[in-house]
Every structure is written in structure tokens, then in C-alpha cells.
Amino acid sequence: MFDLLSEEMVYHIFCFLDLSSFIKCSRVCRKWRRISDDEKLWNLYGEFFGTNKPIDQYIGWRKMIKHVTDSSDNYLYKELTGSIKTYGIVVTNSSVKQSLISKSSIPIQYSYHRTTKFTLKYYRPNKTINQIDNDYRMFYIVDIPEYYTNKQKKCMIQKYTSVSRDYDWINIFVFICSNTDVPYVTSITNEISARIRVITIDEINDAFDWIGKMIWRQDLMYHSCFCPREIPLTQQELYAMTNFNFPKTKLLKTKYSSTNDCLSLCMVQ
């Protein structure tokens, strides 16, 4: 029955499934499993930060979530929906920008399913990483002086992002620059494997909202190398994603339901 569908048709349908349905349909038969190994397909469903195959990174993420939810009454769900404090470093020479950044960080920001309160520590650009007294916080906001040469700007970006190589929990960076510098700074940051946003100072409020979302996604990864692209829109959906106490019969029915849905889509196409 499944062999009657061409590989092109199955691939096309896989592109329209959600992550859960995609996983279940990948188990239908060997042919579908082989098609589902395509990395381009997986990039539609998640972000991958490791070197293993996407399916292996996904399985590792599910195992970690299962462990934490089974052992502590869905601890992860409570963490993802509760209020948190998060700490960051701001590097700037400008007292005016420091004031703007400080004011933007005071309100408690609502990001996805929880509120985040930011606590910042300020440093001057002439401080090296070592001179920051090993104060390795979760994220960096770096103000790039407009009078710097392109070489100095590139060195500054590389200096601060290099900390993520030794401290893998630090991979969220916001670089503030002038409108004219945005294209150049963006071209440099595009070569760096981290969560990076390039902004002007006028966009600092949006930047804090973005930081809150990135930290939320990082918590959802729970020390794994995978993060789903499709984030639950409601707390009910989030609970379903992080809860593993469903009866096996329900899971079995869901599997066949997803398979039938996929076949129905194929017939429509």
C-alpha cells in the first residue's frame, strides 16, 4: 500500500506535516524512514547544534525531556512557564546608550509562556574577557563604536563571541551599531555559529524580547543539541510536548491517525 506512493510525493507531503506527525510517519516503513533521513526535511522541523544525524539529536532531546518529566513531575514545564531572572553583560562606552539599555531592561518582559526579568552588568570595551573577572553570564549586549575601523569591529565581534567556544551556555549575542554599519557587522556575524542579532540602539526593546525568547528556546532544549522550530502556541500544547505520561494505547492510536492523515493528504495531492 505504502509502496504505491512515489518518493517525490511522500517527500512533498512530509514538508507539510508538524514535527510529531513527521516522526510517526517516518516509522511506517523502511522507504518512509529512508526519505525522512533527509537533512533538508529535518531543517524544516528543528535547529541542530551537534554533529550527529538529526534523528539522533532529536531522540537525545526526547530522552532528556522524558527523564526530567518522569523524575520530577514535569519540572521542565514548570520552568518554561514560570517567571525567571536572567543575567547578562553589556559592553559600551556610551553613557547615553547605557541609560537607554538600562531603562529597556527594567520592565519584566513576557516571552513566549513566561516572564523574564533582566539583570545587567556593565563593562567598557577596553576590558578583555579575562578582565571581566570570569563573569560569564548568559548573554552579551555589545555596543560597537562607530569610529572603529572595520578591522577593529571584526576583532571586537570575534573577541566576545569566542567565549561561547569554552562556555557553551553562552551563545546569545546582541551587537549594537549604526545604520551604516549594520550590513558589515551582519556579514561578520553570519560566519559565527551562535544566536546573534544585529541592531541599532532604537531597537533595544525588541532585542530584550528576542533575548527572552532565545533563553526560553535554550531551556526547551534542556542540555541537548536540538530545538524544535515549531514552538507550542498555548500552555496546553507545551504541556503535551513535555509530558510523557500518556497511555500507550493512546499513543498507538495517534500513530495510526497520523499515518492516515498523511495518506489522506497524499490522495488530495
UniProtKB/Swiss-Prot annotation:
Domain F-box: 1-45
SUPFAM superfamilies: F-box domain (SSF81383)
Origin: domain of life: Viruses
UniProt-listed Gene3D superfamilies: 1.20.1280.50
Name by which UniProt lists this protein: Putative F-box protein L127
Species the sequence originates in: Acanthamoeba polyphaga mimivirus
Lineage per the UniProt record: Viruses, Varidnaviria, Bamfordvirae, Nucleocytoviricota, Megaviricetes
